[in-house]
Curated annotation (Swiss-Prot):
Domain remark text: The N-terminal and the C-terminal halves of the protein can associate with each other, thereby hindering interactions with ZYX.
Sequence segments annotated as region (Disordered): 133-164
Assembly behavior: Interacts via LIM domain 1 with ZYX. Interacts (via LIM domain 3) with ENAH and VASP. Interacts with ALKBH4, talin, actin, alpha-actinin, GRIP1 and PXN. Interacts (via LIM domain 2) with ACTL7A (via N-terminus). Heterodimer with ACTL7A; the heterodimer interacts with ENAH to form a heterotrimer.
Annotated Pfam families: LIM, PET
Gene that produces this protein: TES
The protein's name in its UniProt record: Testin
Organism: Plecturocebus moloch (Dusky titi monkey)
């Protein structure tokens, strides 16, 4: 398929999740409706991951595409109908062994994802070492957390040009090369094993905090150690604490098998969230989630959340923007050369600011223009003018004077305050 056809087929899937309730705004949101080019809801401005959108198949397609043309093809299966790679995530059902007596129902726990290991006991141990609120038990807070992190850490628009907004043929080609490069140089999936299992594969360099990683203790010296001391020879690369004997550890092949992590320590070095499904990116001796690895390589547009492959873009408020996406967060009007105000780190044009965000003057009850000086005390504001910042009793101008605030009113003296009591 040539680049022109790829550009024509680009779409953001606006029907996907339409009407889904917002888990954050509740009834304040009328239901999810995807903005034309921003990755947010048009109604409440929250992201899709904040809405109760059923995305199991879509997420499996996204992760499947991520693993396509990599060494991790064992984690995907292609649908016979359209050849789309699907992520074969390992769903684990654990049975609680309490059904020895009659009339006792079997208690089962379903995990929406579990490490793909043959030893179910090892997988169970892995899950128990995660914070309870992050264990992906079906229907739980942990399952919702996993779903949110899949959307946040592995955005589809970081790997698939068809999920981006109006890329040029040159940008499509550059993005495809970028994706191919990070798949071959940085992408990996963690491996859960017992540290002692790695010893069976031959001598390994062991990471010891503060030690010389290039040398190994003499084998004779290692054999003389007690079992208790042996268990302390393994240290977590993240927290630097020792690993307990018999506990599972996570290895990352790209990092080298001399490094290992506690399950709860296998985190992105930037956002410090659990690496979803143990999918990591390795760079400069650090773990990254997909989003923050890409951020370390390319600028990201603060408007559309996509990586910028254009040679021309703008920088404002310590953020990067496509030229066409430096727009008012409320009305989408272009802000280049216009006055704007930052509201919650989002640029808003002057008319929208006055209409939707400006504080109201306690004196004249009109919105205060962002370019006009004002006086603020607690949650109350006034125009800093002789017409507005006045004593609520005698109308004396209080600019530069002492005043007494009382529930949105200001007084020049105790006498004036008493007269208004």
């Amino acid at each position: 398929m040539d680049l022109e056809n790829k550009v024509k087929k680009m779409g953001l899937g606006h029907e996907q999740g339409f009407g889904a309730p917002c888990l954050k705004c509740k009834e304040k949101c009328e239901g999810f409706e995807l903005h034309f080019w921003r990755k947010i809801c048009r109604n409440c401005k929250c992201g899709q991951e904040e809405h109760d959108v059923l995305l199991s198949n879509e997420e499996d397609r996204k992760v499947g595409k991520l693993f396509e043309d990599t060494k991790y093809t064992t984690l995907i299966a292609k649908l016979k109908s359209d050849g789309i790679p699907m992520y074969k995530r390992n769903v684990m059902i654990l049975t609680n062994p309490v059904a020895a007596k009659k009339n006792v129902s079997i208690n089962t726990v379903t995990y929406e994802w579990a490490p793909p290991v043959h030893n179910q006991a090892l997988a169970r141990q892995y899950m128990q070492m995660l914070p309870k609120e992050k264990q992906p038990v079906a229907g739980s807070e942990g399952a919702q957390y996993r779903k949110k992190q899949l959307a946040k850490q592995l955005p589809a628009h970081d790997q698939d040009p068809s999920k981006c907004h109006e890329l040029s043929p040159r940008e499509v080609k550059e993005m495809e090369q970028f994706v191919k490069k990070y798949k071959s140089e940085a992408l990996g999936v963690g491996d859960v094993k017992l540290p002692c299992e790695m010893d069976a594969q031959g001598p390994k360099q062991m990471y010891i905090p503060g030690g010389d990683r290039s040398t190994l203790p003499a084998m004779g010296a290692m054999e003389d150690k007690s079992a208790e001391h042996k268990s302390s020879q393994y240290f977590c690369y993240c927290c630097k604490l020792s690993m307990k004997e018999g506990d599972p550890a996570i290895y990352a092949e790209r990092a080298g098998y001399d490094k290992l992590w506690h399950p709860a320590c296998f985190l992105c070095s930037i956002c410090h969230e659990l690496l979803v499904d143990m999918i990591y990116f390795w760079k400069n001796e650090k773990l990254y989630c997909g989003r923050h690895y890409c951020d370390s390589e390319k600028p990201r547009c603060a408007g559309c959340d996509e990586l910028i492959f254009s040679n021309e873009y703008t920088q404002a408020e310590n953020q990067n923007w496509h030229l066409k996406h430096f727009c008012c967060f409320d009305c989408d009007s272009i802000l280049a050369g216009e006055i704007y105000v930052m509201v919650n780190d989002k640029p808003v044009c002057k008319p929208c600011y006055v209409k939707n965000h400006a504080v109201v003057c306690q004196g004249c009850h009109n919105a205060i223009d962002p370019e006009v000086q004002r006086v603020t005390y607690n949650n109350f504001s006034w125009h800093a003018s002789t017409e507005c910042f006045l004593c609520s009793c005698c109308s004396k101008c209080l600019i530069g004077q002492k005043f007494m605030p009382v529930e949105g009113m200001v007084f020049c003296s105790v006498e004036c305050k008493k007269m208004m009591s």
